[in-house]
């Protein structure tokens, strides 16, 4: 198998193998070799990197095609190389969702912040005054009784995702309650939360805790097929330095008991200059502001991702709930 295009394809295939294998390993165990450190510094969800993914997929398909038609290769060898290439293609889609992100970005048109909540009717259950009191009580019980780790401790992917103080106490912490459409065991003791999170539109949920004087640098999300809903569980509403988020150059200031729907695929960052912690309930919602056929495809992609053994194994390794002693 000779030729410039094929040689490039082979190199892309080899490099993508490193990406597929090392990306989850980095997430679980931390970078142990230079290439792992190199790879985790990339945000594979930016528009520029998505364009590179399109080029990569073109080269990968070229490789598969050339392998199949090459008369010099044994059939078994052809099948083996094709199987490897197709699986690399599969896991890159499942882990990075790059091509689908590009497509959704071309057909969606919504503001960064304060998206109409009609696209998530479930917000009413969270924002109902009486129900919110119960939800808030259960969330704070989890915060007080579980050892909720910094995102930096959960995964090396987040090691640059928060500005920490050096006292070991002030950071950005996160506790999953629902992952890949599946409720976590922790909810067995919290019936109000469990009932609210059984909504099939909710794909991921967690408790996000931003300690006093902590900020989250600029970043974007990973999947355009979601909208992000947050309801504020705790903040000091009387503090003039209340925490806020800037998303797509639009500012939103959290208020206890108030929910907001936004698109985290816009560049955004969070600032907490107050002396109080900010706690929000964080939900990834399957996007509904799409044509019906696209909604069905998007839901199918989410369903495939939720059943993927590799991604579920990684999440289990990253987010283990430990109760305080």
Residue ranges and their predicted role:
Residues 228-235, 261, 275-292:
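A short hydrophobic beta-strand segment most commonly corresponding to one strand
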Residues 216-219, 245, 262, 268-274:
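Short beta-strand His + acidic residue motifs that chelate non-heme Fe in jelly-roll/DSBH
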């Amino acid at each position: 198998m000779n030729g410039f295009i094929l040689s490039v394809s082979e190199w892309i295939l080899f490099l993508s193998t490193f990406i597929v294998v090392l990306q989850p390993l980095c997430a679980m165990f931390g970078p142990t070799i230079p290439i792992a450190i190199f790879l985790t510094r990339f945000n594979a969800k930016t528009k520029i990197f998505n364009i590179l993914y399109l080029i990569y997929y073109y080269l990968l398909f070229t490789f598969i095609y050339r392998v199949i038609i090459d008369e010099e290769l044994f059939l078994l060898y052809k099948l083996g190389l094709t199987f490897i290439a197709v699986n690399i293609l599969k896991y890159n889609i499942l882990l990075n969702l790059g091509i689908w992100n590009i497509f959704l970005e071309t057909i969606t048109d919504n503001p960064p912040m304060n998206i109409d909540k009609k696209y998530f009717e479930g917000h009413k259950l969270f924002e109902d005054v009486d129900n919110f009191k119960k939800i808030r009580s259960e969330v704070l019980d989890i915060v007080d009784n579980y050892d909720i780790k910094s995102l930096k401790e959960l995964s090396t992917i987040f090691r640059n995702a928060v500005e920490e103080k050096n006292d070991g106490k002030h950071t950005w912490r996160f506790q999953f309650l629902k992952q890949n459409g599946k409720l976590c065991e922790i909810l067995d003791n919290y019936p109000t939360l469990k009932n609210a999170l059984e909504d099939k539109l909710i794909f991921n949920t967690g408790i996000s805790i931003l300690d006093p004087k902590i900020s989250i640098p600029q970043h974007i999300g990973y999947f355009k097929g979601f909208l992000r809903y947050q309801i504020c569980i705790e903040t000091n509403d009387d503090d003039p330095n209340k925490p806020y988020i800037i998303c797509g150059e639009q500012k939103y200031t959290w208020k206890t008991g108030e929910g907001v729907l936004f698109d985290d695929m816009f560049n955004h960052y969070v600032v907490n200059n107050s002396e109080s912690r900010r706690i929000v309930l964080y939900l990834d919602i399957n996007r509904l502001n799409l044509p019906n056929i696209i909604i069905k495809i998007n839901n199918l992609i989410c369903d495939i991702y939720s059943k993927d053994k590799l991604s579920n194994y990684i999440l289990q390794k990253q987010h283990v709930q430990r109760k305080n002693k």
